[in-house]
Regions:
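Oxyanion-hole/transition-state-stabilizing segment in secreted/luminal serine hydrolases
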Residues: 47, 89-165, 197-198
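C-terminal low-complexity, Ser/Thr- and acidic/Pro-rich disordered "stalk" regions positioned immediately N-terminal
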Residues: 276-321
Length: 347
């Protein structure tokens, strides 16, 4: 009796040891199809190897995320970033990509920079006290303006109404976008990206950069509101870029787009949120396999269920990707096999 107890204790110890050595598994189930929706930041505009007709070869954050998830461009990942698109443009274009929504289980959305860029002449006109048209002329006015000119805008009712209309339209547009996404992809994991300030601490843009923060904060507040309402994820792309806007964007050339390093930081922010690495070799996703065991007389039959489109798992694969409970189950079956003939059947 004493020896039997000792053997049981030894067996339990071995099981516990193997369980502790099991390969950790991400809590996230690997998505089968990724859809990226947004503007030129999503498409990867300005990056080496960027091609508007084929945006899958450059190092955009969307492409980097797809690589981390082991998804293939044009097959299991579609990039629908529209260069120069405002939230209104993206909303207008959604009916053309609604079919992609239907079979996407992960969707990343980013928009806002062009909405605000189109509002820059409104700010410049209010600061100058006269009508200013065009982005270049507006930037000249804003970079030369004294801080008190921006402070005075708080009491400028005409300006407040105009900029308020811009922000209200943005919130309505992204709300409508969220509604369409939720309706057509109710089970998808949807990720909105908070907008960054490309002027943050950039020499020559200090005063306007601080004022831009107030506008961008309003845009991000709208995003937070929509994500809370629809149960979407919100990733802080802003923090990823704002810490070093000069080094992570192309502002040296007066271009607000992220450079290659900036796209890496955006992709890393999303990956960290998901609990994965940008290196696909380091990622192990949750595989939903639920073994079913039936014992008939002297035969043990093991049914291993698996996703319909994957190859049958080998014993080695099960040991690599299985969870702790799978290791314990395997040990129990192994002990049973010492006395009972074992027959495995794969689904």
């Amino acid at each position: 009796m004493k020896k039997t107890v000792e053997r049981v204790i030894s067996l339990l110890f071995v099981i516990a040891l193997l369980t502790s050595l099991a390969v950790p598994v991400s809590a996230m189930k690997k998505p089968e199809f990724l859809l990226a929706i947004g503007d030129s930041i999503t498409s990867g505009y300005g990056l080496d190897a960027y091609d508007e007709s084929d945006p899958y070869s450059c190092g955009s954050y969307a492409n980097l995320l797809a690589t981390a998830l082991s998804l293939e461009g044009k097959e299991s990942y579609i990039n629908k970033g529209l260069n120069g698109a405002t939230s209104a443009d993206i909303l207008k274009n959604l009916p053309e990509i609604v079919n992609y929504l239907g079979y996407s289980d992960m969707i990343v959305f980013s928009a806002g920079v062009n909405d605000l860029q189109n509002a820059i002449p409104i700010v410049a006109s209010a600061v100058a006290g006269k009508t200013v048209t065009g982005l270049s002329a507006s930037i000249d006015v804003l970079t030369a303006a004294a801080p008190e000119k921006f402070s005075a805008l708080a009491n400028n009712q005409s300006f407040q109404k105009k900029i308020g209309d811009v922000l209200a339209k943005y919130e309505k547009n992204i709300t409508d976008i969220a509604e369409i996404i939720k309706t057509n992809a109710p089970s998808a994991r949807v990720i909105f990206l908070k907008q960054y300030n490309p002027l943050n601490n950039v020499p020559g843009f200090e005063t306007f950069g601080k004022f831009a923060d107030t506008l961008i904060s309003s845009v991000n507040a709208s995003m937070e509101k929509v994500c809370l309402s629809y149960g979407f994820d919100l990733v802080d792309m802003a923090s990823a870029i704002n810490a070093d806007a000069m080094g992570l964007t192309n502002m040296l050339n007066y271009d607000v787009h992220p450079n290659a390093a900036g796209h890496v930081e955006i992709a890393r922010a999303i990956a960290n949120h998901l609990g994965i690495s940008l290196d696909p070799a380091e990622n192990t996703f949750d595989v939903e396999t639920e073994p079913e065991t039936t014992i008939e007389e002297t035969t043990v039959s093991v049914e291993l269920t698996r996703p319909a489109e994957t190859e049958p798992e080998t014993d080695a694969q099960t040991e690599t990707t299985g969870c702790a409970s799978s290791v314990s189950f395997a040990m129990i079956v192994a002990v049973a096999c010492a006395c009972i003939p074992l027959k495995k059947k794969y689904a």
